[in-house]
Curated annotation (Swiss-Prot):
Uppermost EC category: isomerase
Assigned keywords, A-Z: ATP-binding, Chaperone, Cytoplasm, Isomerase, Nucleotide-binding
EC number: 5.6.1.7
Protein name: Chaperonin GroEL
Subunit structure: Forms a cylinder of 14 subunits composed of two heptameric rings stacked back-to-back. Interacts with the co-chaperonin GroES.
Entry-linked SUPFAM superfamilies: GroEL apical domain-like (SSF52029), GroEL equatorial domain-like (SSF48592), GroEL-intermediate domain like (SSF54849)
Gene Ontology CC terms: cytoplasm
Catalytic activity: ATP + H2O + a folded polypeptide = ADP + phosphate + an unfolded polypeptide
Protein family: Belongs to the chaperonin (HSP60) family.
Location(s), subcellular: Cytoplasm
GO terms, molecular function: ATP binding; ATP-dependent protein folding chaperone; isomerase activity; unfolded protein binding
Function: Together with its co-chaperonin GroES, plays an essential role in assisting protein folding. The GroEL-GroES system forms a nano-cage that allows encapsulation of the non-native substrate proteins and provides a physical environment optimized to promote and accelerate protein folding.
Length: 542
C-alpha cells in the first residue's frame, strides 16, 4: 500500500488539529459543573458519560493525520487512568495546552529540542513544589472527600467508598458490581475469599442459603489430585477422633475419594467438605501457600517431601469458621500468627514492586488483599442501564483516585495546586529553554481555566484571583463560585493524579513538538467494474 509523507509545520499542524478535536470533546466534562457527553454505540443504547477517558476512547477521526494526533493523546488519557486511576481529563487538557503553546513558538523559529529541555526542567520543578504542598491523607473524612470529588460531588458514593476502605484496610480489595435494584449497597466479606465452591451439593449444611457452613474445622491442603481413598484414610481417622469437621482444599477430589467422602457425610460419620484449590499452575501453589500461612497449616506436596498417606493432624490448618457456596469459599479467622501473615504480605509486596506484568501485579494485589483480611463489594444501583453504566464509571474513578490519595497524599483540588506550584518556580534559564519553561508555566493554568469556563465564570479573572491569594490553600470552588480554603472545603485531589497527568502530558506534547515528519497510508482506490454494455449474447443462449 502506498504511503504519503508530510514534513515540519504541515505535519505538526495536522497533528494539532486532531489533538484539539479530541480535547474539545473531553474538556467539557471537567469540574463539578462539567457537562455530559452522549456517545453512540455500534450496538445497544447510546451512553451518557462524564468520564473523560470513556469519551476519549470513543473518538476516531476520519482524517488519518488528525487521528494520529488524537490517538497519541488518547494514549495519554488511558495511561494516566491505568497508573493513577483518575486525572484523564486533566492530562488531556494539559497535553493540548502544552502542544498548542509550544507549536506557536516552534513555528516562530524556536529550536524544538531546546524547548523540550526547558519544558522538562519546568515540569520537574513544578512536581517538586507540588509534592512539598501535599498532605498525608488522614482518616475516613479525608478519604470520603477525595472519593466525593472524583465521583462528581456525589457524597453518597464518597461515604460508601470511605466506609469500604475503613473496613477492609488500605491493602484490601474493593470491587464494583451492578446491583439488582436501584439502591446502592456495600457488602464486606471478612476473611479470605477465593472463587471455588463445594465439589458436591451433598456437602451443604444450610439448605435455606444453599451453603456449607463449618465451625472450627481442620483444613487439609494438597497441591495434587485426590482420587484414591487409601491415601486419605490415615488422616481421616485422626480427624474423626477429634470430633471436628474437615475441609479438603486440593487440585481436585474425584472418583472413589469424592464418593466416599459424600457417603461419610450423609451417614454422619464425619462432617466434611471439599473444594478445588484456587488458581492454576504456579499461581495455585502460591495461593495454597497463602492459605497455609493464614491457617497455620502445611501444604501436602511431593515437592516439599510430604505425601498424603503420611499426613497427620500437625499438617492441618485451622480456622474459626468456613462458609462455602456453589461459587466461593470464605475462611474466617485462620489460626496463623499475625507475624507469619505479615511476613507473607511483605514478600508479596516485594514481588509486586519487581514484576513488570500488569496482569501479574493485579493477581498479586488480589492475593495481598485476601491475606490482609477483607474484600468489599460496592453494588451500584440505578433505574436504567444507561444510568447504571454512567454511575459505575464514576464509582470506578472515585475508587481509583482514593487509592492514589492514600498512596501518595493529597493536594488542593480544582486545578489550583498546579497554579500555586507554578508560581513558585524560579529557574535561571535562557534562550529557547526559557521559552520551554514559560510554555509549561502557561499551560498548567489550563485545567483551572477549563473548570471555571464550564461553570460559567471568566477564566482569566479566576486564575488571577487564585494566583494573587495570600493563603496558599485558596482555590476556586466552581460549584458555588466562591474562593475558599480548599482543604477546609474538602476540595482535594490526590498528588499522584496531578503528578502522573503532568508527566504524561509533558511527555507526549514534547514528542509531538519534536516531530519533523509524519507518514500515513493513502486510501486504496476502488477499481470500478468493467462496462459490460455492448457485449453480444453468448451463442445458444435465449
Amino acid at each position: 500500500m502506498a504511503k504519503e509523507i508530510i514534513f515540519s509545520d504541515n505535519a505538526r499542524n495536522a497533528l494539532a488539529r486532531g489533538v484539539a478535536k479530541l480535547t474539545d470533546a473531553v474538556k467539557v466534562t471537567m469540574g463539578p459543573r462539567g457537562r455530559n457527553v452522549l456517545i453512540q454505540k455500534s450496538y445497544g443504547n447510546p451512553i451518557i458519560t462524564k468520564d473523560g477517558v470513556s469519551v476519549a476512547r470513543e473518538i476516531e477521526l476520519q482524517d488519518k493525520l488528525e487521528n494520529m494526533g488524537a490517538t497519541l493523546v488518547k494514549d495519554v488519557a488511558s495511561r494516566t487512568a491505568d497508573e493513577a486511576g483518575d486525572g484523564t481529563t486533566t492530562a488531556t487538557v494539559l497535553a493540548n495546552a502544552i502542544f498548542s503553546e509550544g507549536l506557536r513558538n516552534i513555528t516562530a523559529g524556536a529550536n524544538p529540542i531546546e524547548v523540550k529541555r526547558g519544558m522538562d526542567k519546568a515540569c520537574e520543578e513544578i512536581l517538586k513544589h507540588l509534592k512539598a504542598s501535599s498532605k498525608v491523607i488522614n482518616g475516613k473524612k479525608d478519604i470520603a472527600q477525595v472519593a466525593t470529588i472524583s465521583a462528581n460531588s456525589d457524597t453518597a458514593i464518597g461515604d460508601m467508598i470511605a466506609e469500604a476502605m475503613e473496613k477492609v484496610g488500605q491493602d484490601g480489595v474493593i470491587t464494583v458490581e451492578e446491583a439488582k435494584g436501584i439502591v446502592d449497597e456495600l457488602d464486606v466479606v471478612e476473611g479470605m475469599q477465593f472463587d471455588r465452591g463445594y465439589l458436591s451439593p451433598y456437602f451443604i449444611t444450610n439448605t435455606e442459603k444453599m451453603t456449607a457452613e463449618i465451625e472450627n474445622p481442620w483444613i487439609l491442603l494438597a497441591d495434587s489430585k485426590i482420587a484414591s481413598l487409601k491415601d486419605l484414610l490415615p488422616v481421616l481417622e485422626q480427624v474423626q477422633k477429634t470430633s471436628r469437621p474437615l475441609l479438603i482444599i486440593a487440585e481436585d477430589v474425584e472418583g472413589e475419594a469424592l464418593s466416599t467422602l459424600v457417603v461419610n457425610k450423609l451417614r454422619g460419620v464425619l462432617n466434611i467438605s471439599a473444594v478445588k484449590a484456587p488458581g492454576f499452575g504456579d499461581r495455585r501453589k502460591a495461593m495454597l501457600q497463602d492459605i497455609a500461612v493464614l491457617t497455620a497449616g502445611t501444604v501436602i506436596s511431593e515437592e516439599t517431601g510430604h505425601t498424603l498417606s503420611g499426613a497427620t493432624i500437625q499438617h492441618l490448618g485451622q480456622a474459626s469458621r468456613i462458609v462455602i457456596d456453589k461459587d466461593n469459599t470464605v475462611i474466617v479467622n485462620g489460626a496463623g500468627t499475625s507475624e507469619a501473615v505479615q511476613a507473607r504480605v511483605d514478600a508479596i509486596k516485594v514481588q509486586m514492586n519487581t514484576t513488570t506484568s500488569e496482569y501479574d501485579k493485579e493477581k498479586l494485589q488480589e492475593r495481598l488483599a485476601k491475606l490482609s483480611g477483607g474484600v468489599a463489594v460496592i453494588k451500584v444501583g440505578a433505574a436504567s442501564e444507561t444510568e447504571m453504566k454512567e454511575k459505575k464509571d464514576r464509582v470506578d474513578d472515585a475508587l481509583s483516585a482514593t487509592k492514589a490519595a492514600v498512596e501518595e497524599g493529597i493536594v488542593i483540588g480544582g486545578g489550583a495546586a498546579l497554579v500555586r506550584a507554578g508560581a513558585k518556580v524560579k529557574l535561571d534559564l535562557s534562550g529557547d529553554q526559557k521559552i520551554g519553561c514559560e510554555i509549561i508555566l502557561r499551560a498548567i493554568k489550563a485545567p483551572l481555566k477549563q473548570i471555571a469556563t464550564n461553570a460559567g465564570y471568566d477564566a482569566g479573572v479566576v486564575v488571577n484571583a487564585v494566583e494573587g491569594a495570600t493563603n496558599e490553600n485558596i482555590g476556586f470552588n466552581a460549584a458555588t463560585g466562591e474562593y475558599v480554603d480548599m482543604f477546609e472545603a474538602g476540595i482535594i485531589d490526590p498528588f499522584k493524579v496531578g503528578r502522573v497527568a503532568l508527566t504524561n502530558a509533558t511527555s507526549i506534547a514534547s514528542l509531538l513538538l519534536t516531530t519533523e515528519a509524519a507518514i500515513y497510508e493513502l486510501p486504496e482506490e476502488k477499481s470500478s467494474m468493467p462496462d459490460m454494455s455492448g457485449m453480444g449474447g453468448m451463442p445458444g443462449m435465449m
